């Protein structure tokens, strides 16, 4: 999976809405949706901000195994 898909998976596992993410990133809801759909490439700064909003290390978005560990219940 790509980083965009991993962002969606982590966001959903945390129960965070797209609207919350959009506001936190200073984007419209449609703009944020484009990120999760893979229509927008994620740069390092945006990944860091997304990680901050979801309270995770942004590196997990680049690695499927780390993403899995982040979405599994503790």
Where are these regions (language model features)?
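Short, basic-rich loop-to-helix N-cap that marks the start of a DNA-contacting helix
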Residues: 39-49, 68
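Alpha-helical residues within the helix-turn-helix
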Residues: 12, 23, 52
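Short alpha-helical DNA-recognition segment
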Residues: 15-34
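Short, charged recognition helix plus adjacent turn
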Residues: 52, 59-74
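Residues that mark the N-terminal boundary/hinge immediately upstream of a DNA-recognition element
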Residues: 6, 17, 43-46, 57
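DNA major-groove recognition helix of helix-turn-helix/homeodomain DNA-binding modules
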Residues: 26, 45-60
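A short, Lys/Arg-rich alpha-helix, primarily the initiator
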Residues: 1-13
């Amino acid at each position: 999976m790509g980083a965009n898909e991993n962002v969606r998976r982590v966001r959903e596992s945390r129960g965070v809405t797209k609207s919350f993410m959009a506001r936190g990133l200073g984007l419209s809801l449609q703009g944020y949706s484009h990120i999760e759909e893979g229509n927008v490439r994620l740069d390092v700064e945006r990944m860091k901000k997304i990680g901050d909003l979801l309270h995770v290390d942004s590196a997990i978005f680049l690695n499927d195994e780390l993403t899995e560990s982040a979405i599994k219940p503790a």
